[in-house]
Amino acid sequence: MFDIKAWAEYVVEWAAKDPYGFLTTVILALTPLFLASAVLSWKLAKMIEAREKEQKKKQKRQENIAKAKRLKKD
């Protein structure tokens, strides 16, 4: 089975012996995740903006319908 304690010791030893190599490896490993997070955040922001715009449009339409019904009633 995989020994987590031995692996953690190896990683700590590697980070102590070669900090620049360790940081480079960590940054290279995490960069795609950061990029994916940025893209997904941007898409979510666009979806939220579109939903809010659509809700405002529907609200305006409902107000205009109600206004037209009031004028027609009078």
Swiss-Prot record:
UniProt keyword annotation of Nucleus present: no
Compositionally biased region (Basic and acidic residues): 55-66
Coiled-coil portions: 42-74
Membrane topology: Single-pass membrane protein
Cystine pairings recorded for this chain: none
Entry GO CC: membrane
Keywords assigned by UniProt, alphabetized: Coiled coil, Membrane, Transmembrane, Transmembrane helix
Location within or outside the cell: Membrane
Region (Disordered): 55-74
Transmembrane spans: 20-40
Family membership: Belongs to the SMIM15 family.
Name assigned to this protein: Small integral membrane protein 15
Source organism of this protein record: Homo sapiens
